[in-house]
Amino acid sequence: MMIPELGRRPMHRGNEDSSFGDDYEKEIGVLLGEQQRRQVEADELERELNLYRSGSAPPTVDGSLSAAGGLFSGGGGASFLEFGGVNKGNGFGGDDEEFRKDPAYLSYYYANMKLNPRLPPPLMSREDLRVAQRLKGSNNVLGGVGDRRKVNDSRSLFSMPPGFEAGKPGASASEWDANGLIGLGLGGKQKSFADIFQADMGHPVVQQPSRPASRNTFDENVDSNNNLSPSASQGIGAPSPYCYAAVLGSSLSRNGTPDPQGIARVPSPCLTPIGSGRVSSNDKRNTSNQSPFNGVTSGLNESSDLVNALSGLNLSGTGGLDERGQAEQDVEKVRNYMFGLQDGHNEVNPHGFPNRSDQARGTASCRNSQMRGSQGSAYNSGSGVANPYQHHDSPNYYALNPAVASMMANQLGTNNYSPMYENASATLGYSAMDSRLHGGSFVSSGQNLSESRNIGRVGNRMMEGGTGHPSHLADPMYHQYARFSENADSFDLLNDPSMDRNYGNSYMNMLEIQRAYLGSQKSQYGLPYKSGSPNSHSYYGSPTFGSNMSYPGSPLAHHGMPNSLMSPYSPMRRGEVNMRYPAATRNYTGGVMGSWHMDASLDEGFGSSMLEEFKSNKTRGFELSEIAGHVVEFSSDQYGSRFIQQKLETATTDEKNMVYEEIMPKALALMTDVFGNYVIQKFFEHGLPPQRRELGEKLIDNVLPLSLQMYGCRVIQKAIEVVDLDQKIQMVKELDGHVMRCVRDQNGNHVVQKCIECVPEENIEFIISTFFGHVVTLSTHPYGCRVIQRVLEHCHNPDTQSKVMEEILSTVSMLTQDQYGNYVVQHVLEHGKPDERTVIIKELAGKIVQMSQQKFASNVVEKCLTFGGPEERELLVNEMLGTTDENEPLQAMMKDQFANYVVQKVLETCDDQQRELILTRIKVHLNALKKYTYGKHIVARVEKLVAAGERRMALQSLPQPLVA
């Protein structure tokens, strides 16, 4: 029998009495109880069917029909007779199409299709079934908000969820909306998603791709007409196609699993009010205000704004859909999003969550000098509430001078990309904020500075990511991180080649003239790529990351971290040849987005054509006069510097004058240059006397810093050698008070040594007196030991010599074994007085074997054998041979890695009598020495000496010829 339908009641009315809440709770309880009862009855009926059916018998149509009918009738739902119609040949009563499109049959078919394969297939696909199940799980038993549902205590377990109505075959989208199911049709006319896309393939594509495949395509896009026609506003507010929610409607957004792309952006868990965002394209066109400057503003008129605001507070459906299916309309919006470049303007919701409210969104058009709209945030979508975080500098309400329209074109970009499809490289390359966002890197001469300030305010708005929220985070580094993805799409547009060209700008025209001036010479010297980098025209598919494009800064380049390797203040970045910034962008502290092709100093970015010709031409002989105007540049080059040094040795007076005039203004810079310092040294040698003197004057007041510099110290040494005495004295005096610092410095110690060598002793007394009391300490220093040796060589003052030698001789044993002090002792043995050598040898006597086995002291013992007298040498040899016939000290020395060299030195320096004695002792142990690594050295030396002695003896035994 037909089950009577209860009256349809709305979920909420503004003037309901207080008893509605109690009725509502009772209704919920009845529904829950009925659902449990239906489940129990269904289980019992299934068991009964299994009892009357043989396990081996195939399923029959009648059995399936009775089972299904019993489920529908016994379960309290509408029986199969409800569908009416004549019994067809398939065994089912009622209209076949009406029967097969019912969601209850769909669920039954997929649950029992294996038991009865003769069941006719339903009209809905599995995909539609999953959608219905999602809606059922999301809506539970309450249905959609504002729908008209049937309240029936006898619903079947397999009936459609509350809120679904079996619509007529010709039901339009507006009829579905009346039932609260926006954009979802489950009847016989329902199309699958594949059908929708295939049907939509015939529609013309009106949008251009947002990512051109090449740079040429990109240039064509940016040069195209940027005027936004009213018909183009149809795509405004299209949702991001992150899931099927954008295709099926807002009901899918009620899924318990939120879209990960919208988690951080959804302001509250409330449902989007049905009907609040449903505005047809025609309505949008009718309600859009026209700008007085022929630009399209995104704001609706006041009455429409009021209607939208009030509709956002209403929970009932409001209608207002297009005539075509809502699913197809949503699919078109998906396509509009994916190809969202509309003549240079993208009107897609940048926040990427399924927003059903198409509230007004603004656009910054080059022809629209009134900047309204651009709410920048869809957080308050559908609520009709204004953004509470809007700050007073927001560009939404700025009326800019039309004269700055050309500035707005490249300053703001057009937001082509959504954060979902942004370029990762542009995001990572973002630093504090590009100078172009602060108001532009270049200001036309005819534009007022106040308008530039307005542009700066627009840039400040963009620095907040377009969200309207103030910078309330305490950590500036985190604030930068938070807005990386928000501004990545702007960066791609800011890296547009037209940004660098900026056609029509007077300042850029001037730079173009400068560039053309050197273009003929520098055209063949394109900006070099880093070694190993591919010569590609784009990066990650973005045409803005090709050659000669703006180069973004690093996110680590923070003004609070000047020592960061990626900071603009880092030595790494300062020393990078290719990273030179235009003058217009040098005053900004964060990441600088300077052009790779240098605008401010063109000469620094490219090598001179003269220098390149010199290095590439191996056959032509150049002269100094031919490089006039390029001397400094040649001096800083490896090959150019060598060329100048060679030519200065034989240069004429005119050539020397030419070189002198060019290097003098850059003399200090060349002195510290890796190649330029050699040119300065050579000019000190071969320059004219007046020129050398004037060049020496450049050193005054710079001696100390140059002495501590790697290349400057060489220039100071050469100057001390060749300049006049008065200049030498003046230069040396600058070291007073810094002597010990220079002595311990790896560069300064060479300057101190040169002062001791070239400056008279009476003029460097302040240097020598500094060493008194520190001779031993300096003798054990890697650089100080060299200075002490120069003092012993060039300071002949008896008082100075006695003081220095007294400290050395008092610690001979310690200095002899020191890795640096041993050089000082060797120097005394070689250049000292005989009595000083005798004191040292006597100090070492009795410890010769021990000292010979020590690495550093063995060198001192060798010097004692070399420079000692015969008596001193005999004393050392006797100690080595020992007092017994076994010669134990000699055997130990011959097998030692260091002492074996001392034994070899003895065989070289001793007289014949001592050599014969030593050889006799060594021959006894010759076979045993061959087994030791270091003993082999002694064996080889002995064999040579024996062979030489035998030859000498043979020559002596020959009869002497008679003299006539």
Swiss-Prot record:
Q: Which InterPro entries match?
A: ARM-like, ARM-type_fold, NABP, PUM-HD, Pumilio_RNA-bd, Pumilio_RNA-bd_rpt
Q: Where are the Pumilio repeats?
A: 626-661, 662-697, 698-733, 734-769, 770-806, 807-842, 843-878, 879-920
User: Care to name a GO molecular-function term for this sequence?
Assistant: mRNA binding
The record's keywords, sorted A to Z, are:
Cytoplasm, Phosphoprotein, Repeat, RNA-binding, Translation regulation
Entry keyword annotation includes Membrane: no
The UniProt entry's GO biological process terms, in alphabetical order, are: regulation of translation
GO cellular component term of the entry, any? cytoplasm
Q: Where is this region: Disordered?
A: 1-22, 204-235, 256-300, 343-388
Q: Name one Pfam family in it.
A: PUF
Which positions bear Phosphothreonine? T257
**Domain PUM-HD: from-to ranges:** 606-946
Name the major location: cytoplasm
Q: Where in the sequence does UniProt note compositional bias of the Polar residues kind?
A: 207-216, 223-234, 287-300, 356-384
**Role according to the record:** Sequence-specific RNA-binding protein that regulates translation and mRNA stability by binding the 3'-UTR of target mRNAs. Binds the APUM-binding elements (APBEs) in the 3'-UTR mRNA sequence of CLV1, PNH, WUS and FAS2.
Q: What is known of its domains?
A: The pumilio repeats mediate the association with RNA by packing together to form a right-handed superhelix that approximates a half donut. The number as well as the specific sequence of the repeats determine the specificity for target mRNAs.
- This protein is called what? Pumilio homolog 3
Task: Name the encoding gene, please.
Answer: APUM3
